[in-house]
From Swiss-Prot:
Protein name: Transcription elongation factor SPT5
Residue sites binding RNA per the record: 575
Residues carrying Omega-N-methylarginine: 677, 692, 694
KOW domain sequence ranges: 269-302, 416-447, 468-499, 590-623, 700-733
Length: 1083
């Protein structure tokens, strides 16, 4: 073929191609102007064929075009290579390339294309309706995707392929890390943005593209720019970025996408796992996952409904308006009750296994099934308590209590420890048992217990649960019983029953809250202040023993046998009763740690060890009793000593091994006279040569109020807290400081003799030829036989007066000088404060006022084990009154016999005037000069000053003698208690205070802090100078003696010497002697 023919052929092809292009364009415009509603498939195929023909012709003409034309075409094609093909189809109309080739320059082509496009758009808007325009654009632009054309029409592409076009390339800006001040990353990014805006329209705008400050990156920000110099220009002058001004690190292209990668934590919720609601009426309620819809981001929950039955009732009773105006009240959790809803007029429909009410679905068991958004629930770290689970479902149906939502990137929430036995609860190895070797966060490494598996296996924490078998000894590490230990007695599917070591209760605990252990619980609470079995005070009148320790509460067995639950703060103080002593049913001394038998009451037949004594109650521990950890309480009169008691410090034995049976003798609150008078530092003083072991504790001195007589603390007063043979620990009143003092330097308050004074036993002869002078060992019986000793143990309880009326006594006339009546002792020495050798001249007569040699003349209270306060004077008339007809030295007148008044001041009464033998006392005599008044006997004993007497003395004055023990002894301080009204006796030294009434605020040893109403001040007075005020009708009273001591009540009426009292706790009526009652201060 010749060149001319070739050129002609090419020209024909060009013309043919151009004509074809023009026809296509005309056809397109014609269809647009006519407003055709759809394009048929043959037309689409023709367009594709035309495109293919155009591509082939383009390739064939590459060699035949003039040099300039290919240059224009090459430029366009190069740009097309970079861009995607589907963008060409979207941006260029068909035949646009032909127009460009024919155009003389590219500017005209762009202008013509804009004009034609605008013209066509105007035609469309003018001629077409909105629906037709929408359909046109849908068909125009919703063509098949590039993937269908390039990759053979696949429906969808993989994510990797579709995201490739969005990845950064070499021609994109780079990310540069710049060191920033920690904590100021976000503020620095904002300041760079403001700087960019400020420089945007200046001659030197910033060349950076963006700034990124991710939340998880500390100390760095990312700056996007093409060059490092652009970054330096931008950060120059920014204070927070001066650390990174000289060094910026470029992020590799492959790692740039990780900077902005957002990983959203999606909770791994599984059916039957637990969640809590965040808001609304169900806020903080526990719920169980029924199923999850990840696509809709919803979750269906099973929960206990909260239905407002009052609102339903109000609505059904045409009170809609009122119900709406009512203040919103959150209804309680309650299972759905269809019958109750119907009874209120509600409409309940049935839908298969569910009941429908107000659009909500309820199961037949009453649970609500409702869908919530994922954002409305708390899915992480939800651990239902055992009480919630029991309330949620009585009999769990395959519920896995150990399913806990997965926690990623957070603090581990399991409590697995190396050595725990575990079991796989999900996965392919379910039910495989093993032992934990190591714990690394949520990854647990175990050694399986299987013959075919010899290697260690690693599991996530949520796939394991603890496994226990019967007989394991475990410790509770969480929950209500935290800290308790016990033996597993039963293992159920979802919880474990263990038998507590300490309280001997059965505890129901979740397996996750247990841990294997070998030790036993200490029985001390979380704060370390209280322990199991400790005696605590619940209120001023009630004590109890802690029988169960829980995290926030105690269970206390009170003195009435009831178990009460109290919070830790309600226990005010501990009671220390290590030295308490009581009497059993056979009048035996019983102490703490003694073994006793119960012979009466609800616990009759039991045997136990005394743990605590309080008043007339004893708290016992029996190992055979399961209830309350073996602790029970009963009254001391229902006990009998079973024999041997556990070893204790026995330091109170008297001469010849005699052990006093009175609990008052060894009680530190009521020290015996031996401790007061016998000399603190004299080993063997008053004990006939028998001394305690060196360094052993002296219980007699503990609790006494003493004054320091020598040394740097001379004159200080304090209470003895501990004492040995040589030293004593004294707590000073003024400084609240406890110091150690030599016992030789101590003097008890109320005594004028130094404590270290030796005994004067055995001086022969002394005054009145008494052998020995103080008669410490020659009396038989040595101590006056008081039976019974304690108030409350007598039968009958009140009165105990034999005979009750005059004339029934046998013998009717018997004086104090009757040799058959042992007038021993005649008088308690400590009624007066005097020294042994104060009398300047010896009197030829005994202290009783007659020359009759008394043996002994008066009891020597220097024996450390004898408390003369409690020695009854037998017979009723002491020798001091000089009235007996048996005196060999005097012939009394017919009226010489009288009975002393049992008032508190009786021992200070003067001797009677010429009614009988009148004795002339020496100047140093212990008795005041008698006045000429006649003595008037008083048949009614006083609350404190009455000395028990036995019949036998003549009583012309008509005095009724009483059985020993029926009254309150002269110097007894047992009646002293707080909050009662008292009167200061005339024996007190301060005359301004004598006769005033007050209220006892506190009692320390024998000293009482009394608030005096008249002078409005608080003074410390010994109990021997106080007497209680007798209450009257309707007064608030407090029992000061007897088995009901410390109990309070109201005095309803008075019948002779008795009063009818309505007790406070149970409003029980009791008849009590008025001597046993003290008047309480009324508000």
């Amino acid at each position: 073929m010749s060149d001319s023919e070739d050129s002609n052929f090419s020209e024909e092809e060009d013309s043919e191609r151009s004509s074809d292009g023009e026809e296509a364009e005309v056809e397109e415009e014609r269809r647009s102007a006519a407003g055709s509603e759809k394009e048929e498939e043959p037309e689409e195929e023709e367009e594709e064929e035309e495109e293919e023909e155009y591509d082939e012709e383009e390739e064939e003409e590459d060699d035949d075009r003039p040099p300039k034309k290919p240059r224009h075409g090459g430029f366009i094609l190069d740009e097309a290579d970079v861009d995607d093909e589907y963008e060409d189809e979207d941006q260029w109309e068909d035949g646009a390339e032909d127009i460009l080739e024919k155009a003389p320059n590219i500017d005209n082509v762009v202008l013509d294309e804009d004009r034609s496009g605008a013209r066509r758009l105007q035609n469309l808007w003018r001629d077409q309706r909105e629906e037709e325009l929408g359909e046109y654009y849908m068909k125009k632009y919703a063509k098949s995707s590039v993937g269908e054309t390039v990759y053979g029409g696949s429906d969808e592409l993989s994510d990797d392929i579709t995201q490739q076009q969005l990845l950064p390339g070499v021609k994109d800006p780079n990310l540069w890390t710049v060191k920033c001040k920690i904590g100021e990353e976000r503020a620095t990014a904002i300041s760079l943005m403001r700087k960019f805006i400020a420089y945007q329209f200046t001659d030197t705008p910033l060349q950076i593209k963006s700034v990124v400050a991710p939340e998880h990156v500390k100390g760095y920000i990312y700056v996007e720019a093409y060059k490092q110099t652009h970054v330096k220009q931008a950060i120059e002058g920014v204070g927070n970025l001066r650390l990174g001004y000289w060094n910026q690190q470029m992020v590799p292209i492959k790692e740039m996408t990780d900077v902005l990668k957002v990983v959203k934590e999606v909770a791994n919720l599984k059916p039957k796992s637990w969640v809590r609601l965040k808001r609304g009426i169900y806020k903080d309620d526990i719920a169980q996952v029924d199923y999850v819809e990840p696509s809709q981001n919803t979750i269906s929950l099973k929960m206990i409904p909260r239905i407002d039955y009052d609102r339903i009732k109000a609505r059904m009773s045409l009170k809609d308006w009122f119900a709406k105006r009512k203040k919103f009240k959150r209804p309680p959790q309650r299972l759905f009750d269809a019958e109750k809803i119907r009874s209120l007029g509600g409409d309940v429909a049935s839908d298969g296994d569910f009941l429908i009410f107000e659009g909500n679905r309820y199961s037949r068991k009453g649970f609500l099934f409702k869908s919530f958004a994922m954002s409305a629930v708390i899915t992480e770290g939800v651990k239902p308590t055992l009480s919630e689970l029991e309330k949620f479902e009585d009999q769990p149906e395959g519920i896995d209590l150990e399913v806990v939502t997965e926690s990623t990137g957070r603090e581990r929430e399991h409590n697995f420890q190396p050595g725990d036995n575990v079991e796989v609860c999900e996965g392919e190895l379910i039910n495989l048992q093993g032992k934990i070797l190591s714990v690394d966060g949520n990854k647990i490494t175990i050694m399986p217990k299987h013959e075919d598996l010899k290697d260690m296996l690693e599991f996530p924490a949520q796939e394991l649960r603890k496994y226990f078998k019967m007989g394991d000894h475990v410790k509770v590490i969480a929950g209500r019983f935290e800290g308790d230990t016990g033996l597993i007695v039963r293992v159920e599917e979802n919880f474990v029953i263990l038998f507590s070591d300490l309280t001997m209760h059965e505890l129901k605990v979740l397996p996750r809250d247990l841990q294997l252990c070998s030790e036993t619980a200490s029985g001390v609470d979380v704060g370390g202040q209280h322990e199991w079995g400790e005696l605590v005070q619940l209120d001023p009148q009630t004590v109890g023993v802690i029988v169960r320790l829980e995290r926030e509460t105690f269970q206390v067995l009170n003195m009435y046998g009831k178990v009460v639950t109290v919070r830790h703060q309600a226990v005010t103080r501990k009671k220390d009763n290590r030295f308490a002593v009581a009497l059993d049913s056979e009048q035996n001394n019983i102490h703490v740690k003694d073994i006793v038998k119960v012979i009466d009451g609800p616990h009759s037949g039991r045997e136990g060890e005394i743990r605590h004594l309080f008043r007339s109650f004893a708290f016992l521990h029996c190992k055979k009793l399961v209830e309350n950890g073996g602790m029970f309480v009963c009254k001391t009169r229902h006990l009998v000593l079973a024999g041997g008691s556990k070893p204790r410090d026995v330091t109170n034995f008297t001469v010849g091994g005699f052990a006093p049976m009175s609990p008052r003798i060894s009680s530190p609150m009521h020290p015996s006279a031996g401790g007061q008078r016998g000399g603190f530092g004299s080993p063997g003083g008053g004990s006939g040569g028998m001394s305690r072991g060196r360094g052993r504790r002296d219980n007699e001195l503990i609790g006494q109020t003493v004054r320091i007589s020598q040394g740097p603390y001379k004159g200080y007063i304090g209470v003895v807290k501990d004492a040995t043979e040589s030293t004593a620990r004294v707590e000073l009143h003024s400084t609240c400081q406890t110091i150690s003092v030599d016992r030789q330097r101590l003097t008890t308050v109320g005594s004028r003799r130094p404590g270290g004074m030796t005994s004067t036993y055995g001086r022969t002869p002394m005054y009145g030829s008494q052998t020995p002078m103080y008669g410490s060992g020659s009396r038989t019986p040595m101590y006056g036989s008081q039976t019974p000793l304690q108030d409350g143990s007598r039968t009958p309880h009140y009165g105990s007066q034999t005979p009750l009326h005059d004339g029934s006594r046998t013998p009717a006339q018997s004086g104090a000088w009757d040799p058959n009546n042992p007038n021993t002792p005649s008088r308690a020495e400590e009624e007066y404060e005097y020294a042994f050798d104060d009398e300047p001249t010896p009197s030829p007569q005994a202290y009783g006022g007659t020359p009759n040699p008394q043996t002994p003349g008066y009891p020597d209270p220097s024996s450390p084990q004898v408390n003369p306060q409690y020695n009854p004077q037998t017979p009723g008339t002491p020798a001091m009154y000089n009235t007996d007809q048996f005196s060999p030295y005097a012939a009394p007148s017919p009226q010489g016999s009288y009975q002393p008044s049992p008032s508190p001041q009786s021992y200070h009464q003067v001797a009677p005037s010429p009614a009988g033998y009148q004795n002339t006392h020496s100047p140093a005599s212990y008795h005041p000069t008698p006045s000429p008044m006649a003595y008037q006997a008083s048949p009614s004993p006083s609350p404190v000053g009455y000395s028990p007497m036995t019949p036998g003395a003549p009583s012309p004055g008509g005095y009724n003698p009483h059985t020993p023990g029926s009254g309150i002894e002269q110097n007894s301080s047992d009646w002293v208690t707080t909050d009662i009204q008292v009167k200061v006796r005339d024996t007190y030294l301060d005359t301004q205070v004598v006769g005033q009434t007050g209220v006892i605020r506190s009692v320390t040893g024998g000293m009482c802090s009394v608030y005096l109403k008249d002078s409005e001040k608080v003074v410390s007075i010994s109990s021997e100078h106080l007497e209680p005020i007798t209450p009257t009708k309707n007064n608030k009273v407090k029992v000061i003696l007897g088995e009901d001591r410390e109990a309070t009540g109201v005095l309803l009426s008075i019948d002779g010497e008795d009063g009818i009292v309505r007790m406070d706790p149970d409003e029980q009526l009791k008849i009590l002697n008025l001597r046993f009652l003290g008047k309480l201060l009324e508000a």
